[in-house]
Amino acid sequence: VSAAIPVGTVNDYPRFGYRGFMVDVGRHYFPVSYLKQIIDMLALHNINYFHWHLTEDQGWRIEIKKYPKLTEIGSMRPRTLIDRETQTYDETPHSGFYTQEEAKEIVKYAADRFITVIPEVDLPGHMMGALVSYPELGCTGGPYEIPCKWGVFPDVLCGGNDRALQFAKDVLNEIMDIFPSPYIHIGGDECPKVRWEKCPVCQAKIRELGLKDTPKHSKENQLQTYFMSEVGKVINDRGRKMLGWDEMLEG
């Protein structure tokens, strides 16, 4: 049997420059070995950005050396909701976090496969993992508990507290020491303002900044804009670009 293959050239390239895949390890921890398997599959499918969602209400998963309680306390929860209708829990403790060296290992493993790791630290909402560890960062001062179920929770970083703002800056500086990605994701979504509306520290900051309610934006939403802008300066000063969820624009 004889056969012939026509002479030709195949030019194959992806349609989109950004081809991303997100893994949420905040709600459920995955070991490094499993993440490497995911990265191998991403490379096989020409995905070039691995969006690593590292922090959540239900758990803080990345080592921050300046704030060791984040992983000593904030990475653990006693159980997890497994059926919303019956409110059934698995009664199994869940924990786990990545050391900075493990995170760097993932960064290199991905880079060797032409994938950039984009870290996400979601703030100022979705911060119960931080508030449990450092209650002074919240409006009420706690005590707080790690949620064992899903949803949006009223306790967030205190938007008027300079210490909470410095915490966010410190965390992101360590994140940028680990991750060379040009993009740093800071969340910005699902940040209820019920605590800020009654918090004397937040209201004092609102008055200091001269923020007023407008037909489109409450003064508390504008306080979030201030908070995110200050955080963004730290990112931009290090030559990076800030990413966030669409709700960031509500301020």
Residue ranges and their predicted role:
Residues 1-183, 199, 230:
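Feature activates predominantly on carbohydrate-active enzymes
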Residues 165, 169-251:
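Gly/Pro-rich turn-and-neighbor structural signature
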